[in-house]
């Protein structure tokens, strides 16, 4: 193809993604679009086709973004090339959404005709507006008995401020309105800008590791053209590689002769080292490099930290390799090595939220077959010392001595909770119990209320979401953003087993709740730890002060049972032997206690 043909082809390209709150029908709509454009044969079609991970299918959520190419013949008789980038809906995967949107010019905003606008709908719309995307509202599930499309249309206009007069009324499940959506994409989503004759600039928006071909980059070509045989260069580190294959996903990988401006596809270049590529980096040609890198992505800072340890210590290197491969595919995951007296060698990992942490743990166990122990989640505290230093602490075991601490600041988030009016009282009570400060409350319509609180992140990462769902019978939707750091009365609580501190069980708690939390954990540990042949005291301590204690009574073994009579010195000898054995056991009894159960206890305490 010459330059003129490529420019004509570029005018026919439409790059778009689908954004929505969880369960508003995003993946189902993607399935219907694939069917309508005959991208996938009816034999290969299955529900949630783009959710290729088993975990995504089981949980019914999208975790990873997916990009596929479709061809659509519009009513004007022209054939258009669509690049559909499917995105997750959960707050923990906002980073995936922002990466998808950076590769698009338009976004289909799916809103449930019965539930209306939810907290995550708003968060995703603001991301799309930040990227200057053309937003096409779609009111989905109009075939539900509780559907009220007109009310939702007004909500879209009043709450988001988008013109919803031309919003498509659709039912992805029943296949209603799909053609109308495709026609709107053709008419309203702009073709990609960019110059096919300019030096190559390709944005890496995702990557995946292949055992045979190395790292495979998923890219959006912003300027220029790339083809097999080209020598490409990473603009962040200057590393060069020879392109072996380029292609697109349909959703299977299909090789192509080239990828040109506006295309979304993959590039394989025998990249063997995971560290050589970074999501958000710019790829250019080594012999004709671009003058500057593309804007890339804002680096996401982890909000929740936890220790990950292999149950078998010889799996430490396997765990490191597994984390590196997951990080390639999930740039928001961060990790560094750490050691624990109780658990040995492992990693301190940073996550965007609890669901993100849960998904990473499950992927490590399933995809890499490593049995893990996770410590209780923690957040980043700012500890100000008496010598006027500020230390960032994400691991309770790194907390300085209490005598050196002047004051501690903890992260607060702005929590936006959308809830039916009848549950407002329950939401406010829960938020206040979690040390939240009320900010404001708006009525979206006659029945639904948007409540905003400032809540400590540490309270949210434990059980806030579960408690919110149970206190509102599942009707509340929730979204949060980092707000600020505030001074708080925080203390480090240590758990002592048989007089020894167990570093993996330490946690940070507000002074007000210290006694209550300490008592709960001590009682739980008493039930979990098996009885020994000696008494084991379990204590919760703040510094030198013991705030809660419980004892596991000794298990008595009668070593004299086999002595029916005989000399007393024989009996004394057996008792002395038992006493020596008990003393020897005291040193390493913890190694045999169920460490996974201990950590689950501290996690749920």
Curated annotation (Swiss-Prot):
Reaction(s) this enzyme catalyzes, per UniProt: GTP + H2O = GDP + phosphate + H(+)
InterPro entries: EF-4, EFG_II, EFG_III/V, EFG_V-like, EFTu-like_2, G_TR_CS, LepA_C_sf, LepA_CTD
Membrane topology classification: Peripheral membrane protein
Protein residues bound to GTP: 23-28, 140-143
Pfam name, any one: GTP_EFTU_D2
Top-rank taxon, per record: Bacteria
UniProt cross-references to Gene3D superfamilies, sorted A to Z: 3.30.70.240, Elongation factor 4, C-terminal domain, Elongation Factor G (Translational Gtpase), domain 3, P-loop containing nucleotide triphosphate hydrolases, Translation factors
tr-type G domain: residues covered: 11-193
Annotated GO CC locations: plasma membrane
Main subcellular localisation: membrane
Keywords: Cell membrane, GTP-binding, Hydrolase, Membrane, Nucleotide-binding, Protein biosynthesis
Subcellular location: Cell membrane
Keyword ATP-binding: no
UniProt GO molecular function: GTP binding; GTPase activity; ribosome binding; translation elongation factor activity
Any one GO BP annotation for this protein: positive regulation of translation
EC number from the UniProt entry: 3.6.5.n1
Functional description taken from the UniProt entry: Required for accurate and efficient protein synthesis under certain stress conditions. May act as a fidelity factor of the translation reaction, by catalyzing a one-codon backward translocation of tRNAs on improperly translocated ribosomes. Back-translocation proceeds from a post-translocation (POST) complex to a pre-translocation (PRE) complex, thus giving elongation factor G a second chance to translocate the tRNAs correctly. Binds to ribosomes in a GTP-dependent manner.
Protein family (similarity comment): Belongs to the TRAFAC class translation factor GTPase superfamily. Classic translation factor GTPase family. LepA subfamily.
Protein name according to UniProt: Elongation factor 4
């Amino acid at each position: 193809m010459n330059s003129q043909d490529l420019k004509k082809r570029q005018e026919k390209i439409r790059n778009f993604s689908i954004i929505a709150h969880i369960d508003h029908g995003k993946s189902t709509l993607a399935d219907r679009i694939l069917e309508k454009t005959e991208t996938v044969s009816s034999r290969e079609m299955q529900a949630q086709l783009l959710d290729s991970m088993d975990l995504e299918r089981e949980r019914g959520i999208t975790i990873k973004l997916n990009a596929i190419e479709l061809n659509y013949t519009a009513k004007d008789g022209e054939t258009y090339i669509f690049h559909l980038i499917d995105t997750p809906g959960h707050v923990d995967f906002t980073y995936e959404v922002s990466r998808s949107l950076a590769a698009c010019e338009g976004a289909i905003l799916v809103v449930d005709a019965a539930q209306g606008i939810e907290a995550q709908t708003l968060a995703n719309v603001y991301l799309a507006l930040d990227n200057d995307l053309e937003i096409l509202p779609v009111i989905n599930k109009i075939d539900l008995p509780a559907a009220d499309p007109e009310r939702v249309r007004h909500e879209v206009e009043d709450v988001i401020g988008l013109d919803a007069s031309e919003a498509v009324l659709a039912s992805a499940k029943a296949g209603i309105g799909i053609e109308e959506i495709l026609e709107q994409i053709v008419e309203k989503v702009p073709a990609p800008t960019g110059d096919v004759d300019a030096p190559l600039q390709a944005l890496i928006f995702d990557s995946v590791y292949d055992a045979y071909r190395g790292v495979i980059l998923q890219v959006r070509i912003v300027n220029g053209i790339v083809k097999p045989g080209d020598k490409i260069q990473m603009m962040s580190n200057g590393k060069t590689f020879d392109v072996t294959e380029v292609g697109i996903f349909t959703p299977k990988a299909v090789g192509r002769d080239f990828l040109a401006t506006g295309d979304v596809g993959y590039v394989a270049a025998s990249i063997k080292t995971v560290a050589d590529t970074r999501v958000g980096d710019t790829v250019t040609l080594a012999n004709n490099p671009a003058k500057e890198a593309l804007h890339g992505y804002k680096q996401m800072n982890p909000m929740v930290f936890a220790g990950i340890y292999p149950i078998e210590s010889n799996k430490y290197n396997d765990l490191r390799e597994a984390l590196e491969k997951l990080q390639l595919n999930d740039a928001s995951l961060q990790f560094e090595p750490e050691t624990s007296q109780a658990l040995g060698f492992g990693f301190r990992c940073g996550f965007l939220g609890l669901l993100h942490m849960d998904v990473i743990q499950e992927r490590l166990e399933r995809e890499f077959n490593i049995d893990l122990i996770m410590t209780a989640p923690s957040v980043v505290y700012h500890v100000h010392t008496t010598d006027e230093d500020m230390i960032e602490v994400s691991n309770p075991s790194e907390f300085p001595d209490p005598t050196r601490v002047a004051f501690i600041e903890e992260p607060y988030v702005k929590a936006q909770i959308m809830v039916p009016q009848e549950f407002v009282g329950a939401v406010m009570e829960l938020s206040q119990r979690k040390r939240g400060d009320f900010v404001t409350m708006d009525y979206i319509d006659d029945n639904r209320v948007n409540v905003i609180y400032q809540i400590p992140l540490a309270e949210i990462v434990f059980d806030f979401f579960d408690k919110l769902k149970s206190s509102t019978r599942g009707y509340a939707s929730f979204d949060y953003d980092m707000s600020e750091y505030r001074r708080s009365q925080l203390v480090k609580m240590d758990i002592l087993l048989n007089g020894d501190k167990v570093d993996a069980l330490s946690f940070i708690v507000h002074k007000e709740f210290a006694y209550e939390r300490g008592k709960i954990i001590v009682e739980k540990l008493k039930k979990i730890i098996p009885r020994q042949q000696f008494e084991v005291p379990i204590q919760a301590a703040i510094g030198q002060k013991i705030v809660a204690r419980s004892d596991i009574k000794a298990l008595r073994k009668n070593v004299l049972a086999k002595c029916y009579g005989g000399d007393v010195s024989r009996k004394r000898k057996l008792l002395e032997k038992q006493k020596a054995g008990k003393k020897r056991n005291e040193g390493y009894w913890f190694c045999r206690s169920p460490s996974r159960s201990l950590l689950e206890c501290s996690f749920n305490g």
